[in-house]
A protein has these predicted regions:
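Short alpha-helical elements of helix-turn-helix
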Residues: 3-5, 25-36, 47, 61
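Helix-turn-helix DNA-binding motif, specifically the short coil turn and the N-cap/start of the second
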Residues: 55-59
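Exposed, interaction-prone assembly regions rather than primary DNA-binding/catalytic cores
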Residues: 119-137
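Residues within the alpha-helical elements of helix-turn-helix
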Residues: 37, 52
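Append "Primarily bacterial transcriptional regulators
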Residues: 49-50, 67
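Short capping segments at the starts of secondary-structure elements
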Residues: 41-45
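N-terminal leader segment of winged-helix/HTH proteins
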Residues: 1-25
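Charged, amphipathic alpha-helical coiled-coil/dimerization segments
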Residues: 15, 65-125
Length: 137
């Protein structure tokens, strides 16, 4: 199989495994990726979220709408630029971080079971370089 195919099926397997654990808290794998970005930096725009997650703005809108319905985020007009909407985590979302982070650790541990640290390091380097190759201008 090609590296692209293997990357794709691994992404889907990781997403499904994570979603199986997070869905009990009403969070999809896509929403998890948005929350992760907001936990790193709260109060950013939809465009910044889509760029950091690596999704289209349309996909971000859908994920943000679900998070807003679940009362995990709020969206408000940016005070410095009224054309932009700023996304902020609610207290509920901040508390949820402590519950969801262990799920990610669990999924990663299961995925890497039986693989040496040396091989994991090589895989990280290869995946990082393929990403750089594909996103270079």
């Amino acid at each position: 199989h090609s590296v692209g195919y293997l990357s794709r099926i691994n992404f889907r397997a990781f997403s499904k495994a994570l979603e199986n654990l997070t869905e009990a808290h009403g969070v999809t794998a896509g929403q998890w990726r948005i929350l992760r970005v907001l936990w790193e930096e709260d109060g950013i725009t939809q465009r910044e979220i889509s760029e950091r997650v690596g999704i289209t703005e349309a996909t971000a809108v859908k994920g943000l709408a679900g998070l807003e319905t679940a009362k995990l985020i709020t969206r408000e007009v940016d005070k410095s630029d009224r054309r932009k909407m700023v996304t902020r985590l609610t207290t509920k979302a901040k508390r949820l971080k402590k519950k969801l982070i262990p799920f990610v650790v669990d999924v990663n541990e299961r995925a890497l079971k039986g693989i040496s640290q040396k091989d994991v390091d090589i895989a990280r380097r290869v995946l990082a370089q393929t990403y750089l190759n594909l996103t270079a201008n």
